[in-house]
């Protein structure tokens, strides 16, 4: 009998999982809370790592399409101090795909969505509860009262995962505050900012705070302000005036990134799960991505979510008659893989928002490569 697989969450990890299972002839349903693929902005760009995100896309048969959408020049990054002095300027080799080329999250999500049958994603389905059925499997309840059932439930439902509670009662920790803004049509309307940021990423590093900007493929800039965790209401970050006050004394060329932004700033808490989080495997359910291992956003989250999806899909496809065994194998490997990555992410997050962040980040980006070991 066919195993009915439900994926809660249509982010990059859930869609990667669905795509690879589809390639193996295994159908799934992805339940997503959004009204459509274009219901809300998908955030900025990300760099896909060869050993994780790019590997997952290769397993999905989408490496060629990724190359057509990615921007190798988006790897360029500049690190400045509050005076505007350049501390680090990295320029990738022109046209090279040997590193970690950038791609807009929206473009990557569309690439995955376009690779799936049209009825794979059930939009407007926000999961609110999953209860075990007497004969095995799960009954799923959605926000509007609709219900359905499945044999295997995979939680790809992000930081505030509903599925996570079926496996662990772990609590999230508040580690930082992020405020996001957007600057539209930067080349035409703000050429000085276009030159400042370049084709990739800019980080302006101060004491316990960072002002960053990222070029997107649509000609806009995504501006992000990272601050240490504080006992301060999010509403206090919703005006540009309040944000400019945080950067008093900085070079006006840098704070122009805030002044040029359209619309109100969007603040949010950055949270993380405890490093080393594990759970006892439970039949018919598991987690991938942020639902499984929420980490500070330092470049690993989406990559590891996609690799989770690829590895879980591979185990399910290799053992279709025993999904519980496939889940156990996936989980043990995932726990071991994620632990050092979560430790690294926490260290980098702390380094970036420290009193000595500028010196530490320069040292991090300019450290010599480790010599190859001789066998």
State where each predicted segment sits:
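Conserved mid-domain beta->alpha element of the FAD-binding
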Residues: 6-35, 154-155, 159, 245, ...
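Short, surface-exposed charged micro-motifs
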Residues: 129, 212-213
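Alpha-helical, largely C-terminal catalytic domains
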Residues: 247, 337-375
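FAD/FMN-dependent oxidoreductases across multiple families
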Residues: 195, 199, 206-209, 215-221, ...
């Amino acid at each position: 009998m066919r195993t009915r697989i439900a994926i809660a969450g249509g982010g990059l990890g859930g869609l990667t999982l669905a795509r690879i299972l589809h390639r193996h002839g295994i159908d799934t349903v992805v339940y997503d809370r959004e009204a459509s693929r274009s219901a809300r902005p998908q955030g900025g760009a990300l760099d896909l790592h060869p050993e994780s995100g790019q590997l997952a896309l290769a397993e999905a048969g989408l490496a060629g399409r990724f190359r057509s959408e990615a921007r190798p020049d988006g790897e360029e990054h500049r690190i400045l101090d509050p005076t505007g002095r350049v501390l680090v300027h990295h320029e990738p080799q022109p046209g090279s795909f040997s590193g970690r080329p950038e791609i807009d999250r929206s473009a990557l999500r569309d690439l995955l969505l376009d690779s799936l049958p049209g009825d794979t994603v059930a939009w407007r389905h926000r999961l609110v509860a999953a209860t075990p059925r007497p004969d095995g499997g799960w009954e799923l309840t959605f926000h509007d009262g609709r219900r359905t059932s499945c044999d295997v439930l995979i939680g790809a439902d992000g930081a505030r995962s509903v599925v996570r509670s079926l496996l662990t009662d772990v609590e999230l920790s508040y580690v930082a505050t992020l405020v996001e803004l957007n600057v539209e049509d930067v080349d035409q309307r703000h050429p000085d900012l276009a030159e400042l940021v370049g084709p990739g990423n800019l980080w302006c590093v101060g004491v316990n705070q960072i002002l960053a900007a990222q070029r997107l493929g649509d000609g806009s800039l995504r501006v992000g302000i990272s601050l240490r965790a504080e006992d301060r209401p999010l509403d206090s970050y919703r005006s540009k005036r309040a944000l400019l006050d945080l950067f008093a004394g900085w070079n006006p060329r840098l704070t122009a990134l805030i002044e040029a932004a359209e619309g109100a700033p969007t603040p949010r808490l950055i949270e993380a799960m405890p490093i080393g989080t594990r759970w006892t495997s439970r039949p018919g359910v598991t987690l991938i991505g942020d639902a499984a291992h929420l980490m500070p956003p330092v470049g690993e989250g989406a990559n590891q979510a996609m690799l989770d999806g690829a590895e879980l899909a591979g185990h399910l496809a290799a053992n279709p008659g025993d999904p519980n065994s496939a889940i156990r194998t996936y989980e043990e490997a995932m726990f071991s893989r994620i632990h050092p990555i979560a430790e690294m992410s926490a260290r980098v997050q702390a380094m970036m928002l420290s009193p000595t962040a500028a010196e530490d980040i320069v040292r991090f980006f300019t450290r010599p490569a480790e010599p190859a070991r001789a066998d």
